[in-house]
Amino acid sequence: MPEPLDLWIGKDEVEGVPSQPRQDVKPPPHWRLEAVVATERPRSLTVAADGRTAAFVQDRDTSDVWLLELGAGAPSRLTTGRDPAPYWEDTEPRISPGGALVAYADQGSVWVVAAAGGPPRKLAEAGSPVWLGDDRLVVSVERDDTSRLAVLDVADPWPRPLCGSKPQATGVPGEPGIERYGDESEAAVSPDGTAVAFAFTPRHDLLRTEIRVADVASGAVRTLTGTPGLADKGPAWSPDGATIAFSSERSGWYELHLVGADGTGERQLTQAGADFTAAEWHRGGGRLVAVRCRRNRFDLVTVDAATGEVTVVAEGGSWSSPHWTEDGAVVATYEDAATPSQIRLVRPGERPETLHAPTPLAVRSAPHVRPEDVTFTSFDGLEIPAFLFRPAGASPARRVPAVVYPHGGPTSYYGDEWDGHAQYFLDKGYAWLAVNFRGSTGYGRDYERRNHGDWGVGDTKDCLAAAAYLRTLDWVDGRRLGIFGASYGSYLALLAVTDDPEHRFRCAVAKYGDCDILTSWAQGDREGVQDMGRMMAHPSRDPTAYTAGSPVHRLGNVQVPLLIAHGELDLRVSPKQSEELVQELRRIGGKAFEYVTYPTEAHGFLRGGLELHFYRRLERFLDWYLM
């Protein structure tokens, strides 16, 4: 792994003084950060219409597109130099129905490249391409401060709106009786290519997402589903074009539902008390493949389209992006706590076959710790789920320090997935507690909405309850606890040391997070602002909630050192948030903190050298204060 160039690192300070290396930091016996950072991640898998070829993204220093002939050897790299993209926001590459072209998004534009190889061609400023025949694409474009779907001719790439009438800027129902001011996403083209199903979120109700269908020729739109304050997502056409499957949270879980393409006959298909995603119909039409979430373990399942019966094809771990192959098998990506991301082929009754696993031997040979599912009680009696990793050798006679890790989002989760950075620190002797605080997904709608209107209050107390739980374990040294998070997890880490009169944590790490959610609301990109509005409403409606959720007002309470890190190109959480935090710490005085910025990085440290630099800084910081 090459060392990061100095010009890739902006500020690197300890209380305003240039940071200096430590000579006494030693790696653990079995793991190296270089190997963790070098572990490539195949993801965002799609399969061609004939079921023979897969396209996927593989993260390294870039997020390039690769092709894999199913059952025919090693994959081939199709693009070079595609910008690194965070997996949680990137879109899938798509193979044209005839197999000649691959479409993908990069640098704010849609591109196509010959599947046989060659230079890519930029079509238009757009994203999320989906093929409409072999010569057109449905893409997402930004118009009137909304995300709209458009049709793009590959030969003459000028986008025209998919939906015929202009959105209504008032946010009230428009012609012809259909709300038009909102965001269109998740395009799914009908088998005959005459219609596109999509998800629509109106601006006046950000909790609502409905399924709509647009006629490609006329632009006429009809609404198939929708309930105030609830979401329907992920439309998928049946092979005969008569039925659309989708996930809906109406029951309290994202169960699978079916509706006729004409809007009739809607019914709930599954009754599993679980979330289902990524549904795709079998070519025969009688069943679907999907991913079922089971307390943030993600099983690969099939669902009978008539009865709703769920059959487990392969348990998680974490399965994602499942697709049918030509011969009725399923290809999907898989990972778990001991297995980095790989592409697998699954046939009923057989062990999954690994098709592509770009894991370094240094990682394959290293010992992995699998987590234990635990729960603990928070301040109000709510049971909080978490994954607890116990390092080898931890015992009452050899008590270890521990790190509490709240995930980002907040509408997200920590699942049974590969976390090489956690494994590295486990090998050093740290315990690791990954907390799915209130507001996390995977535990039902009521749990997910527990933090609405309450950012930084109840969920912070969940993190404090995590520290209290760790103190009950006789193999954890309760005096040596740290908290580390990224994005929303960074925000909670900061709150955990501003709003805790017991001062449970000895140090905290804030990686590209908020310190003032009111100014962050003003600074953020459209998606971030809408996400905040969905959960916290407009600041003018409840300014006290924004104040209560902003740790910058209470930094005088901080009694422990902070490590603060931010990318200077971050649009989701502006780097001004960390600047504001540092300025206020300096104004108060007497606070210990370290501050590092990265000029080339956005929301996520994606380039290998800079990721390595940050985790070395993290190691140095945690070792100094906890080891």
Regions found by a protein language model. Give the residues of each.
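Beta-propeller blade-edge and WD-like acidic-aromatic loop motif
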Residues: P4-W31, T53, V57-R77, A100-L101, ...
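Residue-level detector of conserved, well-ordered beta-strand and adjacent loop positions
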Residues: V37, T79-T80, A124, C163-G164, ...
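Cap/lid segment of the alpha/beta-hydrolase catalytic domain
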Residues: P358, A362-R479, A486, S520-Q530
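Conserved beta-propeller blade repeats
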Residues: T39-V57, R82-A105, L123-E142, K166-P202, ...
